[in-house]
C-alpha cells in the first residue's frame, strides 16, 4: 500500500510507528523560507546587482516574495522526500504563500503578502475552534504525534492554540498597517517565532498533566 500524502489521524496506531524528521532538520525546513524572506528583503538591491534577473520581480519586497515562494516549495518537496507525507500546517501555509505571493508579484502590491499571516492564522484558529464546536480536537494533526494526551488535554490545548492563532492574526494586522515594510518583515521573522516558542513552552504544564505516556509509566510502576 502506498503511504498517505497527508499526515495520518492522530488516533491511527500506524502513525506512532512512523519515523519523524530529525527535529533540527524539521526546524530548518520550517524556518528556512522565513530566513530567506528576511535576507532577500534586507539585501534586495545587492541581490539584484549580483543576479540581474531578480530585478524582474521589482523592489526588495517583491524579490523577497519570489524567493520566499521558491524556498517554501523546496521545503515542502524536501519534507515529502524525507517522510512521504506533507505536514498539515506547512502545506496549508504553503498554499496561501503561493496564492498571495502570486498576487503580490502580478499586481506589484505588497499588501497581499503582508495579509498572508493574517489569513493563515485566522484559518488555523477558526479550524481548531470550529473543530471543538463539533466535538473534534484537531491539534493532533498539527503536532504530528510528538506526544499523546488524553481527550481533556487535547481539548484544552486545542482551545488555547486556537485563541493563540487568532491573537497572531490580530498582531500581524496591527504591525503591517502601522509600521514600515522593513519593520513588518523583521517582526514576522524575529518577533513571531520567539512569541510562539514562549507560548509553546508555557503549555508544558498542561501537556505533562494530561500525558498518556506519563500515566502509562505510572501505572506500570504501580503494578510492579
UniProtKB/Swiss-Prot annotation:
Membrane topology: Multi-pass membrane protein
Keywords: Cell inner membrane, Cell membrane, Membrane, Transmembrane, Transmembrane helix
Pfam family, any one: IspA
Compartment(s) where it occurs, according to its Swiss-Prot or TrEMBL record: Cell inner membrane
Top-level lineage group: Bacteria
Record has Nucleus as a keyword: no
Record keyword Membrane present: yes
Membrane-crossing segments per the record: 20-40, 61-81, 86-106, 123-143, 156-176, 187-207
GO-annotated cellular components: plasma membrane
InterPro entries, sorted: YciB
PANTHER family recorded: INNER MEMBRANE-SPANNING PROTEIN YCIB, INTRACELLULAR SEPTATION PROTEIN A-RELATED
Functional summary from the UniProt entry: Plays a role in cell envelope biogenesis, maintenance of cell envelope integrity and membrane homeostasis.
Family that this chain belongs to: Belongs to the YciB family.
Protein name (record): Inner membrane-spanning protein YciB
Source organism per UniProt: Mesorhizobium japonicum (strain LMG 29417 / CECT 9101 / MAFF 303099) (Mesorhizobium loti (strain MAFF 303099))
Amino acid at each position: 500500500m502506498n503511504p498517505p500524502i497527508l499526515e495520518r489521524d492522530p488516533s491511527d496506531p500506524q502513525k506512532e510507528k512512523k519515523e519523524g524528521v530529525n527535529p533540527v532538520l524539521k526546524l530548518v525546513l520550517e524556518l528556512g523560507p522565513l530566513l530567506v524572506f528576511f535576507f532577500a528583503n534586507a539585501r534586495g538591491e545587492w541581490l539584484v546587482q549580483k543576479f540581474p534577473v531578480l530585478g524582474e520581480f521589482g523592489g526588495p519586497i517583491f524579490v523577497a516574495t519570489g524567493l520566499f515562494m521558491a524556498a517554501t516549495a523546496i521545503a515542502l518537496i524536501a519534507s515529502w522526500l524525507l517522510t512521504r507525507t506533507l505536514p498539515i500546517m506547512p502545506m496549508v501555509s504553503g498554499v496561501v504563500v503561493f496564492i498571495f505571493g502570486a498576487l503580490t508579484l502580478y499586481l506589484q502590491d505588497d499588501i497581499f503578502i503582508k495579509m498572508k499571516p493574517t489569513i493563515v492564522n485566522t484559518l488555523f484558529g477558526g479550524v481548531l475552534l470550529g473543530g471543538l464546536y463539533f466535538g473534534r480536537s484537531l491539534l493532533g494533526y498539527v503536532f504530528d504525534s510528538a506526544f499523546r494526551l488524553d481527550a481533556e488535554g487535547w481539548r484544552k490545548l486545542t482551545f488555547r492554540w486556537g485563541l493563540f492563532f487568532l491573537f497572531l492574526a490580530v498582531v500581524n494586522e496591527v504591525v503591517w498597517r502601522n509600521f514600515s515594510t522593513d519593520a513588518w518583515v523583521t517582526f514576522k521573522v524575529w518577533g513571531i517565532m520567539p512569541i510562539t516558542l514562549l507560548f509553546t513552552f508555557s503549555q508544558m504544564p498542561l501537556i505533562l498533566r494530561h500525558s498518556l505516556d506519563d500515566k502509562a509509566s505510572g501505572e506500570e510502576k504501580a503494578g510492579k
